[in-house]
Amino acid sequence: MTNIRKIHPLMKIMNNSFIDLPTPSNISSWWNFGSLLGACLALQIVTGLFLAMHYTADTTTAFSSVTHICRDVNYGWIIRYLHANGASMFFLCLFIHVGRGLYYGSFTLSETWNIGITLLLTVMATAFMGYVLPWGQMSFWGATVITNLLSAIPYIGSNLVEWIWGGFSVDKATLTRFFAFHFILPFIITALAAIHLLFLHETGSNNPLGISSNPDKIPFHPYYVTKDLLGAVLLTLLLMTLVLFFPDLLGDPDNYTPANPLNTPPHIKPEWYFLFAYAILRSIPNKLGGVLALISSILILAIIPLLQTTKRQSMMFRPLSQCLFWILVADLCTLTWIVGQPVENPFISIGQTASILYFSLILIIMPTVSLVENKMLKW
């Protein structure tokens, strides 16, 4: 008798995606982060739903409603900190997931890669709007500064900013619409993630060697289910350590002060996961140029498949490209660090150098070195 999971219309989809899915036998722990992102998304939706039950999207009560959640709601503090630090875990997994795609050449699966970039942009938009909701000082001024960047767009910029604000400044209308979008976007992200998986399962996963996986595949369950569970346990350990011991480590102290339009904080900066892009924006003196550089720093991922010059997909046997990849990682860490420093020399120069290096590595240096490797290995 055929197993019900193989014939039932709904269970068959789950079976072909998570149980009997033929998976390359040699994929490493770097492939765990896709499932961890799914777990993070589920956590964010559940905790966000409970927070939304007690939150009020009004400029007069938003800050006090968050305080009420932490002080008066049963276990409200842990729900709030799980949601805030869960976002950090989400982005940590997201950056590692994208980095793994770059390192092992997964961007050759173009549909999966492009949906992934769409997912990255949507998650960034969701996180930005979520950061505005507590209505602290950094929430208010972060929203003002980032939305104001759209005024750099010629002709329609000023009208566009006022349209997003719903008035002449960030106010009640802005907060209400940001809450509405922040609530609906995670469900759109879930749909995009399902499409991401659909495209991935059309072609099958890449593997560390960058060769065809077809000759040697094993079922996803129990092998990779067990492997993913180990990753989930380790991520939970890291998240709970943050939540229970250092809940405000990745936050900004200014956000514990209610929003005040008349008092500007000395340093306006977004959450740590946006800092590399914000550093690129800040390193260009021209406003429009900065905005274009900011957008390009993310959208550059879309043209990486077009810049592929190597004849070997993975970087596993390409030591020069490996070296450049880790220089790129170090460069992104430098950009993240530089935003926390005052806007003065030598920090301005370091930021500008790191920004130029970021684009040079991806657009010029890495493709050129790949050609050199082809020559050296006589491909």
UniProtKB/Swiss-Prot annotation:
Subcellular location: Mitochondrion inner membrane
Keyword Electron transport applies: yes
Cofactor note as given: Binds 2 heme b groups non-covalently.
InterPro entries with a match to the protein in the record: Cyt_b/b6_C, Cyt_b/b6_C_sf, Cyt_b/b6_N, Cytb/b6-like_sf, Cytochrome_b, Cytochrome_b_C_euk/bac, Cytochrome_b_N_euk/bac, Di-haem_cyt_TM
Main location: mitochondrion
Binding-site residues, heme b b562: H83, H182
Binding site for heme b b566: H97, H196
Any GO MF annotation of the entry: ubiquinol-cytochrome-c reductase activity
Positions with a binding annotation for a ubiquinone: H201
Keywords attached to this entry: Electron transport, Heme, Iron, Membrane, Metal-binding, Mitochondrion, Mitochondrion inner membrane, Respiratory chain, Transmembrane, Transmembrane helix, Transport, Ubiquinone
Membrane-traversing stretches: 33-53, 77-98, 113-133, 178-198, 226-246, 288-308, 320-340, 347-367
Pfam families: Cytochrom_B_C, Cytochrome_B
Membrane topology, from the record: Multi-pass membrane protein
GO cellular component, one term: respiratory chain complex III
Domain of life: Eukaryota
Gene3D superfamilies: Cytochrome Bc1 Complex, Chain C
Function of the molecule: Component of the ubiquinol-cytochrome c reductase complex (complex III or cytochrome b-c1 complex) that is part of the mitochondrial respiratory chain. The b-c1 complex mediates electron transfer from ubiquinol to cytochrome c. Contributes to the generation of a proton gradient across the mitochondrial membrane that is then used for ATP synthesis.
Subunit structure: The cytochrome bc1 complex contains 11 subunits: 3 respiratory subunits (MT-CYB, CYC1 and UQCRFS1), 2 core proteins (UQCRC1 and UQCRC2) and 6 low-molecular weight proteins (UQCRH/QCR6, UQCRB/QCR7, UQCRQ/QCR8, UQCR10/QCR9, UQCR11/QCR10 and a cleavage product of UQCRFS1). This cytochrome bc1 complex then forms a dimer.
PANTHER family, A to Z: CYTOCHROME B
Miscellaneous note of the record: Heme 1 (or BL or b562) is low-potential and absorbs at about 562 nm, and heme 2 (or BH or b566) is high-potential and absorbs at about 566 nm.
Family note: Belongs to the cytochrome b family.
Protein name: Cytochrome b
